[in-house]
Amino acid sequence: MMDVVDRSWDMAHRPRVALDVETSLVYGRRILEGVSRYLRANRPWSIYLEQHELGSDLPGLLKRWTGDGIITRQASADSVKQLKRRRLAAVDLGDIHPHLGILRICSADLAIGRMAAEHLLERGFQSFACAGFSGEYWSQRRREGFIGEVTHAGYECSVYESPRAGLKVWKQDQKRLVEWIRALKKPVGVFATNDLRGQHVLDACARENVAVPEQFAVIGVDNDELLCGLCNPPLSSVIPNPERIGYEAAGWLDRMMQGDMPTDSLIEIPPQGVSVRQSSDAFAVPDPVVAAALRFIRERACDGASVQDVLDHLRVSRSWLERNFRKLLNRSPQAEIRNVQIKRCKELLRTTSLSLEKIAALAGFEHPEYMSVVFKRETGDTPGHYRGSNEKEL
């Protein structure tokens, strides 16, 4: 957790800080919310901010700014040289140029890809695909995380990539997307490396009359509620943590303007979880009874449901359920219950300040001590250490 800057430091001087962060995208606005939250708790700055899109030049703000510091999403090798020449405190939040020699704070893209894979694997998918953008570092890293997790589980992954471009290329791209979708083995779980790509994929599915999510489950990234809601069906999405990125960036810039330089050149902020919407809300198992068991466990595990409760609900024998779970999912019903409970624990540890006793109750454990034992066994980490490493509020 970042140390809070002493509010008494030179209150007569408000540092002049430029915020070169796009206001046209939800991600950028949430970064600015994190900066704002930091400033409300610490000394104020004199802020220079213009509304603009990612990629606009402002013009040439990075080359012309002569204030005390800058937070930017658009750093380049050339602009960083000039910032260093002027000895200007700077934090880079961009996801295009990864190695510029200044502090970079960004989303943990590998972890985002892994989280998307876990979401689809938990739903029983055994065929996987990834749709991203060529030439985009962040998309490449998310793809790597997704494929790595899928490969570790023993499966392969088909990849579709194309450049980010305008309407003319988009029309050609949609045609190729339809052809790619047509060739995939179904049912298939598809990871789109951002919500915009997820919208492209769902639109292509509609053109091909593919059943979503039963035959083609899709998950994106960014949790842009407007864009996800415009999709048909609504798009599931991995939730990054741009507010924390903004908070961290403001804190580090404040310290740097006081001469405290960071020892690390990269800080990666993990995702918060998955917002499940209709596009991936399905279980890709051929047996309807096993699918019903999975849905029951998802809905009731955190109420304390046991394997016996599953058996009573479905009216099947324990041996039948155990055998078919292992055949179709390669895990036991009890392991599935624990998996759902641990995911709930992680979510509450990351995003709330609730006590372990309260978290245990909300995750379906009778005692916090037993929850801690199970959490340590399943994750290799204690609840307290996990919370300290992943908490949303700093």
Model-flagged regions — what are they?
Residues 1-69, 78-307, 311-313, 322, ...:
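Bacterial carbohydrate/catabolite-sensing allosteric modules
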Residues 306, 332, 355-357, 367, ...:
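Residues that mark the N-terminal boundary/hinge immediately upstream of a DNA-recognition element
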Residues 325-333, 374-386:
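A secondary-structure capping/hinge motif
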Residues 371:
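Binding-interface segments
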